[in-house]
């Protein structure tokens, strides 16, 4: 099996299904008569910029990110670790307290990521308010941030 075809199938499966484990990808590939090991799938996942993110149901599933999206994600992780002082949450609101002069940077990075759980954000000098549609959406954002920080 050619690597390109196998990786094309992996991309297709990740887009079509909520896949939690690499073993599931091995099973789906086998149904297409593509026999591979979990180690091969693991290498393919790295090469394809596939990463785990929380699903609507709170499960950690694989998703493919573009290179641009991946760079923004890396910038957000770095900045959050450097400048976040405290995160408070209530209902569908998340308040991120930062070192002075840094809240707007966090807001810009959140906007660039365009996470569907976020309706918008309002930032001042040292505080960024992230607004979600619902408490469950905010909890997904909170889980993502906790994985980062």
Curated annotation (Swiss-Prot):
User: Which Pfam families does the protein's record reference?
Assistant: Arg_repressor, Arg_repressor_C
Q: Which GO terms describe its biological process?
A: arginine catabolic process to ornithine; protein complex oligomerization; regulation of arginine biosynthetic process
Give the record's GO CC terms.
cytoplasm
Keyword DNA-binding on entry: yes
GO molecular function list = arginine binding; DNA binding; DNA-binding transcription factor activity
Which superkingdom heads the taxonomic lineage of this protein's source?
Bacteria
Pathway given in the UniProt record: Amino-acid degradation; L-arginine degradation via ADI pathway
* Major localization listed first in the record, in broad terms: cytoplasm
State the InterPro entries in the record: Arg_repress, Arg_repress_C, Arg_repress_C_sf, Arg_repress_DNA-bd, WH-like_DNA-bd_sf, WH_DNA-bd_sf
Cellular compartment(s): Cytoplasm
Give me the segments passing through the membrane.
none
Give the matching NCBIfam families.
argR_whole
Function noted in UniProt = Regulates the transcription of the arc operon, involved in arginine catabolism.
What's the family? Belongs to the ArgR family.
Name of the protein in its database record:
Arginine regulator
């Amino acid at each position: 099996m050619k690597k390109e075809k196998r990786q094309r199938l992996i991309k297709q499966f990740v887009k079509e299904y909520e896949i939690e484990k690499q073993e599931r990808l091995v099973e789906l590939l086998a149904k297409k008569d593509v026999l591979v090991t979990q180690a091969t799938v693991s290498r393919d996942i790295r090469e394809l910029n596939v990463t785990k993110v929380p699903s609507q149901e709170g499960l950690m599933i694989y998703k493919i990110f573009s290179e641009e999206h991946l760079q923004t994600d890396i910038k957000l992780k770095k900045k959050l670790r450097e400048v976040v002082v405290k995160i408070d949450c209530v209902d569908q609101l998340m308040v991120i307290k930062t070192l002075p002069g840094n809240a707007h940077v966090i807001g810009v990075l959140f906007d660039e990521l365009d996470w569907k759980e976020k309706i918008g954000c309002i930032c001042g000098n040292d505080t960024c308010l992230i607004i979600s549609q619902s408490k469950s959406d905010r909890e997904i954002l909170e889980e993502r941030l906790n994985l980062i920080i």
